[in-house]
């Protein structure tokens, strides 16, 4: 029996706040990548 578990989790959070002359600019970038590979071999 062969059991393989590969888990890759990538979380990127970018928060940019700019305040210019009573101007409010909010930029939020959220990138979430989840890769799950499961292999089960029974002989």
Swiss-Prot record:
List all Low complexity biased stretches: 1-37
Domain of life of the source = Eukaryota
> Region (Disordered): which ranges?
1-43
* The protein's name: Putative uncharacterized protein DDB_G0293968
What lineage, starting at the top, does this entry show? Eukaryota, Amoebozoa, Evosea, Eumycetozoa, Dictyostelia
């Amino acid at each position: 029996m062969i059991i393989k578990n590969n888990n890759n989790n990538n979380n990127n959070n970018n928060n940019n706040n700019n305040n210019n002359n009573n101007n409010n600019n909010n930029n939020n970038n959220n990138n979430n990548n989840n890769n799950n590979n499961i292999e089960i071999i029974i002989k």
